[in-house]
Amino acid sequence: MQNNIIIFDTTLRDGEQALKASLTVKEKLQIALALERLGVDVMEVGFPVSSAGDFESVQTIARHIKNSRVCALSRAVDKDIDIAADALKVAEAFRIHTFIATSALHVEAKLRRTFDDVVEMAIQAVKRARRYTDDVEFSCEDAGRTGVDNICRIVEAAIKAGATTVNIPDTVGFCLPTEYGNIIDQVMNRVPNIDKAVISVHCHNDLGMATANSLTAVQNGARQIECTINGIGERAGNTALEEVVMAIKTRQDIFKGLDTRINTQEIHRVSQMVSQLCNMPIQPNKAIVGSNAFAHSSGIHQDGMVKNKNTYEIMSPETIGLKKEKLNLTARSGRAAVKSHMDAMGYQQNDYDLDKLYAAFLKLADKKGQVFDYDLEALAFIDMQQGDEDRLSLDVITSQTISNLPASAFVQVELDGKKISQVSNGGNGPVDAVYNAILAITDMDITMLHYNLTAKGEGAEALGQVDIVVEHKGRRFHGVGLATDIVESSARALIHAINAIYRANKVADLKSHKISQ
């Protein structure tokens, strides 16, 4: 049996399904390239049949990724499989992942079929996928609530049809470790052709068991773990990549000789990137990547740490690429210093625009004095979303609030190269007043669905990141803004969302024009 545990990342498929607003193709590609540097073996990047946007993002990622295998999801339906193959065909190497529900509840209530029908559908789906690639994964949806006899029967049939990976998902997070481990053990010992395929596991965290179930499955013979960065995913989320990888690495007394290809020093950086781009804050006490994961407050713990780090630290923060911040970046620092800090954090220059980053850094350094590495990361990721094609940009903003009186604001923007000013009186607070002014300038009909403010850094001069989700003509758009001033970061978030709407409207107009020709 192989000693390498295959890491199958589904952040861009299962993880993205949990987001309030979809990622752009550019944002998905950023994450995919980061996952490639992290060393994931397989990345599942979308469900191409679901939308033209998903097809485009899968195709774009497939074109750029060279060192990881790109995978797309499809139901056990010919059309799904054909479209997935079409999106993936530009890849260096690709996998088609097809699935069908197998639990009695799903087979009878959702599919309205017999289990014999389901087995035949699985066989035909795998055979069709094998027309396009020799790397086919088959999943028994809701395997956690499927009888073991039926799991073994359909797994054997799928392998005989050509599946090279068979996935046994706990789709609704129902299983406890002992019973899930037993399912994997039964499959290992009862399926006669199991040596011709890799057993994969895909666990959800509804009962908080995703990591434990995945690790127990490995102990019972599974050799692929499906997971996401930070554990993001539907409902309570998926198995967290960083947790299973570091558990295997840290507990070699149990996982003797087993390892992954993951470059663990990239974990912190990728975790932060996914958190920021997906607008999914990481809880402070989150294992491995939370801000408190390596913090020791108790006096007794601190004393032990000073004497010997191993007293309370089972792994070092450096292992996941977490470095202590240095207070040596100021407005006097040059481009080389900024680039050096980005290099030290593991970024390559094609990950960001140094000119834009340095200009944003100087503005922030003038306000803050000292700039930290986490500030640079935030500036790089947020600013690179504000593209050169933006029609709307912020020039000047002022707001005023007097006790018991409505707030007022003055906003000056540049729209299509023309400077426009607007005064707004009667806002329910300064942010509302600024938003009223911007919407008056753009004449945009927008409904605010979500507003979230997060501090990036520490102290009174910390950056404030505002993430919003707005609705326009039935579609949702995400906006993000970053500044030391909350009102300014709020304005920038709205302008970011409006630019996304402008781009979407432009695409719709082009499509309409093409159809009419």
Curated annotation (Swiss-Prot):
Residues 5-268 form the Pyruvate carboxyltransferase domain. Pfam families: HCS_D2 (PF22617), HMGL-like (PF00682), LeuA_dimer (PF08502). GO terms for molecular function: 2-isopropylmalate synthase activity; acetyl-CoA C-acetyltransferase activity; manganese ion binding. Its EC number is 2.3.3.13. One of its GO terms (biological process) is L-leucine biosynthetic process. Its cofactor is Mn(2+). InterPro entries: 2-IPM_HCS-like, 2-isopropylmalate_synth_dimer, AIPM/Hcit_synth_CS, Aldolase_TIM, LeuA/HCS_post-cat, LeuA_allosteric_dom_sf, LeuA_bact_synth, PYR_CT. GO terms for cellular component: cytosol. Pathway: Amino-acid biosynthesis; L-leucine biosynthesis; L-leucine from 3-methyl-2-oxobutanoate: step 1/4. Catalyzes the condensation of the acetyl group of acetyl-CoA with 3-methyl-2-oxobutanoate (2-ketoisovalerate) to form 3-carboxy-3-hydroxy-4-methylpentanoate (2-isopropylmalate). PANTHER family: 2-ISOPROPYLMALATE SYNTHASE 1, CHLOROPLASTIC-RELATED (PTHR10277:SF9), HOMOCITRATE SYNTHASE-RELATED (PTHR10277). Homodimer. This is 2-isopropylmalate synthase. It comes from Histophilus somni (strain 2336) (Haemophilus somnus).
